[in-house]
C-alpha cells in the first residue's frame, strides 16, 4: 500500500521545500489557534504548535496508512519571541531589532502516523548586517515581510540583509529538510 504524506500547512514555502526534496504530498487544511500557554518556553511553544497542526490534520485525513506533517517557525532574540508582523510598524520594529545583530530561528516539525508522534526542533542562528530605514521601506514595499515570522524571508529580497547563518537554511525558510528526512525514516515512511 502506498504511503501518503499530508502537509498540514498553508505555507507556500513549506510546499516549495517538500517539492524541492522530491517528497510527494497532499495538503490538508487544519488550522489551529496559535496562542502560547502561561510560562511556556519558546521551544515548547513552537514544538506544541507543530504537534497540534499535525494532529489536527491527522484527524481530518481518512485512512490509516498516512503521515501528517505539521510545522511552525518563530524567531527569538533577547528572550523575546517574534511571530508574523501585524502591520508595517510591527515589521519595522522586528527588522530594526535584528539590524546588525544575531537572532535565532526555531522551526519545529511533527509527524503523526497511526497515533504515534515524531517531532524535532531545529535552531539556526542568523546574523543580519545593519539595515537602514530606506532599505526597510524598500523591503516593505515588496510585500515579502507581511506573512513571515520575523518579517523576512531568507529566500527572498531579505537575503541581502543576512551576513551569515549557523544552522539550517531550509529551517529558516520554514521546513528543516534534514530533520524531516530523519523523522520520516524514524516513522518508517520510506519502508515497503
UniProtKB/Swiss-Prot annotation:
Gene Ontology CC terms, in alphabetical order: cytoplasm
Substrates-to-products reaction catalysed: dTTP + H2O = dTMP + diphosphate + H(+); UTP + H2O = UMP + diphosphate + H(+)
GO BP, sorted A to Z: nucleotide metabolic process
A molecular function GO annotation: UTP diphosphatase activity
EC number(s) per entry: 3.6.1.9
Keyword terms: Cytoplasm, Hydrolase, Nucleotide metabolism
Spans traversing the lipid bilayer: none
InterPro entries: ITPase-like_fam, Maf-like
Cofactor: a divalent metal cation
Active-site residue list: 72 (proton acceptor)
UniProt-annotated location(s): Cytoplasm
Domain of life according to the entry: Bacteria
Site (Important for substrate specificity): 13, 73, 155
Statement: the UniProt record of this protein carries the keyword Cytoplasm: yes
Pfam families xrefs: Maf
Function summary: Nucleoside triphosphate pyrophosphatase that hydrolyzes dTTP and UTP. May have a dual role in cell division arrest and in preventing the incorporation of modified nucleotides into cellular nucleic acids.
Family to which this protein belongs: Belongs to the Maf family. YhdE subfamily.
Protein name as it appears in the record: dTTP/UTP pyrophosphatase
Amino acid at each position: 500500500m502506498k504511503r501518503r504524506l499530508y502537509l498540514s500547512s498553508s505555507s507556500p514555502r513549506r510546499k516549495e521545500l517538500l517539492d524541492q526534496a522530491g517528497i510527494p504530498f497532499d495538503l490538508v487544511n487544519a488550522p489551529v489557534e496559535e496562542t502560547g500557554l502561561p510560562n511556556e518556553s519558546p521551544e515548547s511553544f513552537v514544538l506544541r504548535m507543530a504537534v497540534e497542526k499535525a494532529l489536527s490534520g491527522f484527524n481530518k485525513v481518512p485512512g490509516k496508512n498516512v503521515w501528517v506533517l505539521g510545522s511552525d517557525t518563530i524567531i527569538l532574540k533577547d528572550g523575546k519571541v517574534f511571530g508574523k508582523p501585524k502591520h508595517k510598524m510591527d515589521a519595522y520594529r522586528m527588522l530594526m531589532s535584528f539590524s546588525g545583530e544575531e537572532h535565532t530561528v526555531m522551526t519545529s516539525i511533527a509527524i503523526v502516523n497511526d497515533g504515534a508522534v515524531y517531532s524535532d526542533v531545529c535552531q539556526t542562528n542568523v546574523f543580519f548586517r545593519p539595515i537602514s530605514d530606506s532599505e526597510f521601506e524598500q523591503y516593505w514595499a515588496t510585500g515579502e515581510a507581511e506573512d513571515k515570522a520575523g518579517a523576512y524571508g531568507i529566500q527572498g529580497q531579505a537575503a541581502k540583509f543576512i551576513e551569515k547563518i549557523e544552522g539550517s537554511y531550509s529551517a529558516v525558510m520554514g521546513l528543516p529538510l534534514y530533520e524531516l528526512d530523519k523523522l520520516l525514516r524514524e516513522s518508517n515512511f520510506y519502508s515497503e
